[in-house]
Design a protein with these regions (language model features):
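Catalytic-core regions of core metabolic enzymes
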Residues: 1-185
Length: 185
């Protein structure tokens, strides 16, 4: 939430147990918000993510980032849950990043939808990685070495939107030069 507050974008917090978060009104459910939602960032225990994704579908959210872990990276049971979430997002035609990711940063749009410790300097390099830990480390180093980025994507488990789609987007949109990516083995 702290990263979003810096972006000066309109944000809504959703938490069924708190009426305020960082001094802002918190809604019990995304359905209670009387506005269109461009992006939902889900950071809750894995066992309730599917219900929240279904709420996002009913709300006609345009995109979803799931930072929560506890899915395919944990074994067969987690993979089954991840597949159910993917099916829901696919059927609703809602792009889904994650789960198990750090999030995204678009410095050209002034958006930090991640759990990175701080927003890096704006530059020309796009950074993509499955590993949120690697991105976190590179953001730390970039601050020390005065390096900048245009966009940063941690795509996690790639249950729906994957590395090849991000590479194609960056290539077609000519949004960055060069593109750096770490591929898992």
């Amino acid at each position: 939430v702290k990263n979003f507050l810096q972006s000066k974008k309109k944000i809504y917090c959703v938490n069924p147990f708190k009426s305020k978060i960082f001094g802002m009104q918190s809604f019990k459910n995304i359905r209670d918000i009387n506005d269109k939602i461009d992006l939902a960032i889900i950071a809750v225990p894995a066992k309730i993510v599917l219900d929240i994704v279904l709420d996002c579908v009913n709300k006609k959210v345009k995109g979803i980032i799931i930072v929560s872990s506890g899915f395919g990276e944990t074994g067969e049971k987690g993979k089954e849950l991840e597949n159910k979430i993917k099916e829901v997002a696919d059927k609703a035609k809602i792009p889904l990043i994650g789960p198990n990711c750090l999030g995204i940063i678009n410095l050209n749009q002034g958006l930090n939808a991640s759990f990175a410790p701080f927003t890096p300097k704006k530059g020309n390099v796009a950074l993509l990685s499955q590993s949120g830990a690697l991105i976190d480390a590179l953001i730390d180093i970039s601050g020390e070495d005065n390096l900048g980025f245009s966009k940063i994507v941690s795509y996690g488990n790639e249950s729906q939107v994957d590395l090849t789609q991000f590479l194609q987007y960056f290539k077609n949109a000519a949004v960055a030069q060069p593109i750096s990516s770490m591929l898992p083995f």
